């Protein structure tokens, strides 16, 4: 990591610190927002398999400006890259992986986290929207 760790950490510094804590060989679900940055900072020589609940296994770092493919997106509808050997599958199979305990770590984005670990990471959107937590509850239990 080339950034200096002084004062408040940036989103990229947090992602870098987290990436260095992930053990070699782990299967990791990356949530939406700041968690997406983690794939950019995996140490050389460490193999981590990244998962997205929309049915992707084997994501790589974020794409450069000339590498964006809008047909290749994560659960947050953001462009991603794939590593050799990556796979696509139905989201029901993706949730079977999560619920079956086949994901080692989940990196969730959060709006708030209490001192006791309670997580608030969803929004109702507009006043007419139906509230939904997405895959967070499955991931919090299954990973």
Identify the meaning behind each predicted range:
Residues 2-13, 62-143:
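Conserved phosphate- and dinucleotide-binding cores of soluble alpha/beta proteins
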Residues 1-84:
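N-terminal active-site beta-alpha-beta segment that forms phosphate/nucleotide-binding
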């Amino acid at each position: 990591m080339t950034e200096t760790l002084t004062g408040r950490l940036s989103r990229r510094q947090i992602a870098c610190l987290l990436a260095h804590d992930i053990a070699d060989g782990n299967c990791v679900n990356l949530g939406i927002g700041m968690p997406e940055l983690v794939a950019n900072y995996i140490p050389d020589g460490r193999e981590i398999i990244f998962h997205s609940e929309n049915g992707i296994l084997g994501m790589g770092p974020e794409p450069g400006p000339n590498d964006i493919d809008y047909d290749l997106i994560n659960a947050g509808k953001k462009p991603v890259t794939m590593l050799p050997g990556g796979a696509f599958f139905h989201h029901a199979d993706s949730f079977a992986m999560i619920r079956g305990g086949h994901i080692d770590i989940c990196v969730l984005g959060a709006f708030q986290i209490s001192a006791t670990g309670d997580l608030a990471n969803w929004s109702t959107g507009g006043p007419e929207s139906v509230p939904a937590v997405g895959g967070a509850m499955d991931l919090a239990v299954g990973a």
